[in-house]
């Protein structure tokens, strides 16, 4: 307390000056002696996009416009950074923010980590003190577009959590922490252990306004900001620019003094109200400078100190007499508190506007103006248009003239040398502004209007090496050496890009190589597999191809099938011609019988063959010119007697002529057209013909009567009936044995060749459906008794009883009904069928014919 009240012994004007300094720290009058370490925050940068950076160890932060209402829709932020190892303590002194349930309308937050809230407050209750755990904090304030209140005012203090000793204006807490003395006994725990409020418990309750007697007529009641008790102060302390009351009641609602003037000279001076004393809060002044000359006006602020509390005080300078925002030259605030400040207009007119809020005050400013090329009466010209300097600026080690005239011919230096300061150290002109300090205080590198060759002139009148320009590093301090730099890719970037591209190319080549290798391996495996299959196919192709359909028909291995699948119409016509040629040569007619049985045993075949042999169904040849003995026929058709002419001679086929083939009977539909000679089929029919020829006792060979030549034949000797029956039985047994041998031989050949065409000979097909087999049956011209020694008779005569017995279908309901002969017009449709009989006609005549085994034997 001694440190604080010792200044009260000074005269009154010194006390007022001290109180003005104390206004910078609310609630901490002891810090007035260290005002350069006290921060008073305004809104010049706090309510922008970036937070206001604060490095002072203590200070005051208020909401915009405090103690008036804060504006709507505003966002302000402050970032306080203390020294490493220190903590920050915040004490709220006034707080009035629009309240809500979760403080989501208007709010104040304190964050130890960015964007991570640790403290949020709103409403009208003063929040408790906040003690940080780190050496930095973020303070954010937000208001919506609705109701506005008075706002907040807080004081912060940074220091270590435990100090061995505290200053005389500080209080040592029980935990070793130091806080300002003003925070003691304020009903708030700034120490963290409540030790700053323990002694106050023994004192009486804080006095209230009713406990005091009314003040005199020339006094006013005030809660002293120093003693924290109510007292009476003289009226002269009101609106004097000094804060005496804790609630600022002595400096609120004061009348604003009038200031400003119209300046019309080539040069002049002006200053803030009460300069060098504090200007009154709420000052609003405007100076209009009109030199009447077209030349530029140079405006210099030789001293400048503004208050930054609340919205902050400011000075705006316009190019011209009008307050045109587009012609605003510069705005000076409390952050520009340094001298000298120079502003140059583009014409002979300037408008200067000074505005101060109603909270606190400062020393203000002092300014001079002059037309370019003129000097003030008390100044010395630098020469030319280089400006002016005063006698106090002569030989002070600082170049006020760009040409250094104020620092030449100094007594302590030789000619063409300049002093570093008033201590006698000098340096030559060649060492001026070459980015190398020759003076201990570095004055040879300050206020450089020109730089030595090889150096770059910065906008802040500094010089750096030209090689440092556009090197992505701020060497000037204001970033002017990195402005308007061309985009040049550094060498290391190019090197990295080349190396990276080479590596990528190598990886791409490796990937392509691996892909090609895998592809070649896959194709090799594929070729190996395909080569094996090709060899197998080649082996199959080297085998002998199966006989064609025509060859099989010519060899008699298969009968001609009309519905055999073909590949083209030409092939169908060739097969049809071949079938007609064979039928024409053999004198057969086609009969289609259903074939169903596939697996008859050999003994049934022998029996059927013997039965067919008895009925004469295998007799395909007869002697030429023989008379056929008539026989009784059981057929429904009338008996037909005609001379049966042989297609094949017993001796040779050479005796046959084309005329005999043209005149022969047996082919339905008339005489067949001349066709190429076909090889007679080598079948069981030839075997039968050979057997008949060998067993015949005919010694004389018959000849064909052709071209008027008579052919003589020897009549066979008469045979008794008993011998005829015995011979017939022996002949049938012989033919049966030969048929067994022929069947066994064909079965062995079928086991070696299982082609679909060979399966037709064995009665086996690849399908399970019933197939139709066309059977060639010779047509007999007459009927006679069967003679085993007579090879001229056909073995099968459809007109005879034996033939009718073979053709008689099986009918369970009417066994006596037999279909009519195949020769002649069909009884159902009236058309002569030359080849294939339609199914509609077969439904009547062949519905219940013999079994498939018998039909196969007929083939």
Swiss-Prot record:
Taxonomic placement: Eukaryota, Metazoa, Chordata, Craniata, Vertebrata
Keyword flag Glycoprotein: yes
GO terms of molecular function: integrin binding; low-density lipoprotein particle receptor activity
Bias type Polar residues, positions: 748-757, 801-814
Subcellular location: Membrane; Membrane, Coated pit
Tissue-wise expression: Widely expressed in heart, skeletal muscle, brain, lung, placenta and pancreas, but not in tissues consisting of a large number of epithelial cells, such as liver and kidney. Expressed at very low levels in a number of tumor-derived cell lines.
Cytoplasmic side: 514-859
Listed SMART domains: CUB (SM00042), LDLa (SM00192)
Originating organism: Homo sapiens
Region (Disordered): 623-678, 693-723, 748-770, 801-823
Residue ranges, Extracellular side: 33-492
Name used for this protein in its record: Low-density lipoprotein receptor-related protein 12
